[in-house]
Amino acid sequence: MNVIFDIGNVLIKWEPKNAFRHAFASDAQIDSFFAEIGFFDWNLAQDCGRSRDEGVAVIAEKWPHYRDLIDGYFDRFGDVVSERIEESWTILKELQSGGVRLFALTNWAKDTWPIGLAKHPDLQILIEDIV
């Protein structure tokens, strides 16, 4: 038997607000920032393969005052994916001990994947392959 786990919000909590807490006084301010720049659409384009530089340029073109802030998202990505979802890891380890082949699926961008992997090196040990 094979089992495929999604990584974001299944094995690892994805909390993009964590990358911006240093710059805003409240979650409501971060939510307003996200709405203003269309953060989730922007992030989807990043997940589809757009580079860090291209993504920063898209924001900087319309909101030059946010250039450094959005660029810092990549530097703070370790904070975005800092928390494991322990219940899922327990299931993963039980399946592994039972001889089940484990795979993972992710849409993390090429610029953020190495950061997430450095934060959670167990992904390489416990998962046979990642798509």
Spans of model-derived segments:
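Short beta-strand/turn micro-motifs composed of small residues
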Residues: T106
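Structured helix-beta-strand junction loops
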Residues: G98-G99, L126
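Substrate-recognition "cap/lid" segment bordering the active-site pocket of phosphatases
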Residues: K110-V131
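N-terminal helical cap/lid subdomain that shapes the substrate entry/recognition surface
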Residues: M1-T90, S97-G98, A109-W113
